[in-house]
Amino acid sequence: MEKSPSYDGSGLVNLIAELERRMTGSSPFPGLEGGLGPTGADTYVLVLFDGLGMAQLEHPDAGVFRTSLFRSLEAPFPTTTSVSLSTVATALSPSRHGQVAHLAWYPDVDLVVNTLKWVTVTGDHVPYDYGGLLPRPNLWERLRKAGLEPITVQPRDFQTSPLTRAIYRGARFEGAWNAEDLVDATVDLAVVPGRLVFTYVPFVDVAGHVSGQGSEEFATAMRAAATIWEGIASRLPPGAALVGTADHGLVEIAEADKVLIRDRRFDGLRFAGDPRGVHLWGDPGLLDDLAELVGGELVDPLPLLGPDPTPEAISRVGERVLLAPPGTAILPKGFDKRLRCYHGGLTAEEVEVPLLLG
């Protein structure tokens, strides 16, 4: 098994804790081992590029990111957007914020839920107290209590989504229509001291999933992300500091390496999680049979989520997690088999993300 991600100094959670410590003097998790360079900024801008792992920095259009690279970080497990964004919104590990998968089992509604869209695997809407998903106070609320203003800059059509209501409780939302708007809004908001401006850029992840990393669509997305980073860095007002990172990397999976689970023997199992790390509940003998069939490794998921798991995290996580072999995706019914790139596992390509300084 690949090693557990870092939660004690080299993880995404530690970057967020480091920023909170700089702005307020304290945070629930340790800050970044080795620090983050000079202190003294009045406002911080944090840009998160969805899907821009360290491996993606090898792309021909990623030169500006290579130039800005300060070090690598480790995304939390599982390496998926809703989990990492929950870590950003709380400065907590998944064990503590309780969001444990892309397709997550919520026992209180007896459903496996797509946590990006808050629908079931068949597409039915799931009503829920989205605003109560994350612990209180979250990062944004702690910043407000300290007299600071947290603001998130996002594509405008995300504003009313269940995920936004869950992740950004307590933060001001500023919508943008396109990449140029993202830059303009971020720069304009950073003029005022005492703010944390969090800008989310989805383009790389979307292009990787839909078209693959060798496509022109992916190259276009990489160029757009690079332009956003350069645009913010070149126009950053005095007194503001620019930091960039990602939520996870991407692994390209060939059609022949997608393992569809359709054997009726396994119908009695519950499946959740991600195609690179499938949460499982059911007969231990069947779990062993499934692992042997796909060539994956069954692991205890709780130690991978971080320290001191809450009752919510324990109730939602699988009895076991089946890690997919390198270069493969495990696809039970309800998992999306159409994608070109996946994530959610523990390989370096999925876990290692950049820490960028502008």
Please describe what each predicted stretch is.
Residues M1-G358:
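Feature captures the catalytic ectodomains and active-site-proximal regions of enzymes
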